[in-house]
Amino acid sequence: MKDFAIIYDLDQTILPAAAVPEETFLPIYEAIRSANQGTVPDEELEEALKKIRTVSMDVIAKEHNFSDAMKEAAKEAFLNRDYKFSCSPFDDWPVVKRIPGKRFLVTSGIPKLQQAKFDALFEEGDFDGIYVDNIYDENRLGKKRLFEKIAEEQGLIPDLIWIVGDNPDSEITAGNELGMKTVQIVRPGIEQSDKASYLICSFYELNDLVTKWEASLKFKA
């Protein structure tokens, strides 16, 4: 049988957003508040800051019309510091290691911050490849291009690649546009979408889904 791959998102898929200590983000909050200068109403700004744990900074800035000064303050605050903390994944993370197929991780964000999460969560060999979609990279590829890159490097057609994540407007949309199988994992607080090919609430369900699909391929072969 041919190889196949599963590409996982990180935040709100493997790692609860609340698992990263709040103090990690305090300097970022303060930098953005200081640069605001009345551009965004205080109440709206506080709502925007609450999203930093779960939503990419570039998306937040666009949605709430951050000024250039606010964007630059956020960028400097994110980039000019080191990160180290302890955090724990969702309880069903160990199930991922039992699910058939090659495993890849693709996550958007700040490389140093995402690396701190990797260091706290993963062991060597947990994934066949890890990719960070760096939101501040001038030559940013984006998740869609990274998915294509993995497919090309692994010699896999889209139908043999699964995309698993929580965000229907990010990894799910990218996977759909490439003709890959998409699975939205609906963690607590995540709104269910009709964009994905499949809906699950845990990796136990993903294991059942992929195992049955793999068995059907073997049967056809």
What does each model-found stretch correspond to?
Residues M1-D42:
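Active-site neighborhood of HAD-like aspartate-dependent phosphohydrolases
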